[in-house]
Amino acid sequence: SHLSHFHLVFEDNLVCTYDEIDKRYHARPIICGSPSIISIPSIIEGPAKPKGYYFKQMLKDLLSISSKEIENEFASTFISYDDPRLTQVATGYVIQAIFFFLTNGNPFCSQYPCRLFNSHWQEELIYTQVKNPVLCKEHLQLLAQAGK
């Protein structure tokens, strides 16, 4: 289908959806539709930080370390507020919103490390959006066809 325009909202509140299966809310960095919504706090809070981060947070009193020390130790492994990488990550979500319309409803790719990969971990997000922000062969072809 031909995409002449689409509507996109950047949200500064956490955006969540309720999962009927596990009966809990999940932060969603992007909800595609009309309009598509990209939530900056959900980019930061949604995808999980490394397991070691949570492990140390649980044991910080036992280990005699502060939350700030743990944050500093793991800073390169997750996106935080005022993070210079946040713009690149948000751009990746804009690309996903565009592909939602180009594919008639499928903004994600199951092939890691495509930029459209649905990252559930911060480290995946950083790799696919900052360190290696490229589309897989299939999505590059789809993009080329859309431009014709």
For every predicted segment, state its role.
Residues H26-R85, L102-K148:
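Metalloprotease/metallohydrolase-associated module, dominated by Zn2+-dependent proteases
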Residues D82-F100:
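ATP/nucleotide-binding catalytic cores
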Residues S1-R28, F78:
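N-terminal low-structure segments adjacent to metalloprotease catalytic domains
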